[in-house]
């Protein structure tokens, strides 16, 4: 299994399984001298951790992070930073009925066919539990980007199933368990999730992420374009089935006279490009939207096969998120931060001394 590392200069390698003793990651390439404590990382992990409301998995994990290396006297040393999160609430007996069968929509079948062995307990390596180390690494990236450039990365749930959530204000995002920017819609979402749980079913979601204060120039054409690497990273999140940058698929119906964001001495007029032109950041907000499929582990009986290829009926009894998207906002923020810090370091390495006479224009014209 060779696809466990993200990044070029700022790399993150995750390890562990859902029901193993621990999960974690090793960060390599973090610049030295940045103040870093476990509390800085814990703030982000607490936003993602399970068991925080009745609408998510009831697995009770504190997700307490331990910094094992790479930090001395409260500052990063430039050495690899090892982060450990111990699993404390595994309940592997819940998965005995799927040891020899495959859940429809899950990685069970493909992991078995590819590796010839699979850890069926909670999905093993394919579990969304493995997004916790990603969020931990993202906390480190967020801190560096914020201190270096003033970059702010924020996300919110834009849709839950067929319910679209109108954007009202960022302040509401941190005040509800759905990460929605609209307090008025929360009761509707709660009723929807309560009914879904009674049905033993699941649903998908749409998450929007915005990075403000990103410097112009990040991205490495042709094949390491910034938007390409963002899409690559976002598709690495469990259950993500679609990614949009800027106007995304709406660009199909837009004329060039509308989609092309005009430039004026006062700044850009519009941001249909999502802050990326030619694979390079423009200095505008980076806007990303991801589509998350319904959770595969549900109580509804479904047809499948067993390891011998014989018909089987699968019903999952473990503790699962009826909508993975409810806890996906900090995960998507972390992924965007990891891509941005990697490209910031790559830009500094090759083009840090480049100076042109053309002034950098504002992200948005007044």
Curated annotation (Swiss-Prot):
Superkingdom assignment: Bacteria
Cofactor note: Reduced FMN (FMNH(2)).
Cofactor: FMNH2
GO CC annotation: cytosol
Pfam families in UniProt: Chorismate_synt (PF01264)
Catalytic activity from the UniProt record: 5-O-(1-carboxyvinyl)-3-phosphoshikimate = chorismate + phosphate
GO MF term (any one): FMN binding
Annotated binding of NADP(+), by residue: 48, 54
Gene Ontology biological-process annotations: amino acid biosynthetic process; aromatic amino acid family biosynthetic process; chorismate biosynthetic process
Keyword Lyase: yes
UniProt entry keywords in alphabetical sequence: Amino-acid biosynthesis, Aromatic amino acid biosynthesis, FAD, Flavoprotein, FMN, Lyase, NADP
Gene3D superfamilies, per database record: Chorismate synthase AroC
Pathway in which the depicted protein is active: Metabolic intermediate biosynthesis; chorismate biosynthesis; chorismate from D-erythrose 4-phosphate and phosphoenolpyruvate: step 7/7
Function: This reaction introduces a second double bond into the aromatic ring system.
Protein's recorded name: Chorismate synthase
Species annotation: Paraburkholderia phymatum (strain DSM 17167 / CIP 108236 / LMG 21445 / STM815)
Lineage: Bacteria, Pseudomonadati, Pseudomonadota, Betaproteobacteria, Burkholderiales
């Amino acid at each position: 299994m060779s696809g466990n590392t993200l990044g070029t200069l700022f790399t993150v390698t995750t390890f562990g399984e859902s029901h193993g003793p621990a999960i974690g990651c090793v960060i390599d390439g973090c610049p030295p001298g940045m103040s870093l404590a476990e509390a800085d990382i814990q703030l982000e992990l607490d936003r993602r951790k399970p068991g925080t409301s009745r609408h998510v998995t009831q697995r009770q994990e504190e997700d307490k992070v331990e910094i094992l290396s790479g930090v001395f006297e409260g500052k990063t040393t430039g050495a690899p930073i090892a982060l450990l999160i111990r699993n404390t609430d595994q309940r592997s007996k819940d998965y005995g009925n799927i040891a020899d069968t495959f859940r429809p929509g899950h990685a069970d079948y493909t992991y078995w066919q590819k590796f010839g062995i699979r850890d069926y307990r909670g999905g093993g390596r394919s579990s969304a539990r493995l997004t916790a180390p990603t969020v931990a690494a993202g906390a480190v990236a967020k801190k560096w980007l914020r201190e270096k450039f003033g970059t702010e990365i924020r996300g919110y749930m834009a849709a839950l199933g067929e319910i679209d959530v109108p954007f009202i204000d960022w302040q509401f995002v941190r005040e509800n368990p759905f990460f929605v920017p609209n307090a008025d819609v929360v009761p509707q979402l709660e009723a929807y999730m309560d009914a879904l749980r009674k049905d033993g079913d699941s649903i998908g979601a749409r998450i929007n992420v915005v990075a403000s204060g990103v410097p112009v120039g990040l991205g490495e054409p042709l094949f390491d374009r910034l938007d390409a690497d963002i899409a690559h990273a976002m598709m690495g999140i469990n259950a993500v089935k679609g990614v949009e940058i800027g106007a995304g698929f709406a660009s199909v119906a837009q004329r060039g006279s509308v989609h092309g964001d005009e430039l004026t001495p006062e700044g850009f007029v519009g941001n249909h490009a999502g802050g990326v032109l030619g694979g390079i950041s423009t200095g505008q907000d980076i806007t990303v939207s991801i589509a998350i499929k319904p959770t595969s582990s549900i109580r509804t009986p479904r047809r499948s096969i067993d390891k011998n290829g014989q018909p089987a009926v699968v019903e999952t009894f473990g503790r699962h998120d009826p909508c993975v998207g409810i806890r996906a906002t900090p995960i998507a923020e972390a992924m965007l931060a990891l891509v941005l810090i990697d490209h910031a370091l790559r830009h500094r390495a090759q083009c840090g001394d480049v100076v042109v006479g053309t002034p950098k224009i504002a992200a948005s014209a007044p």
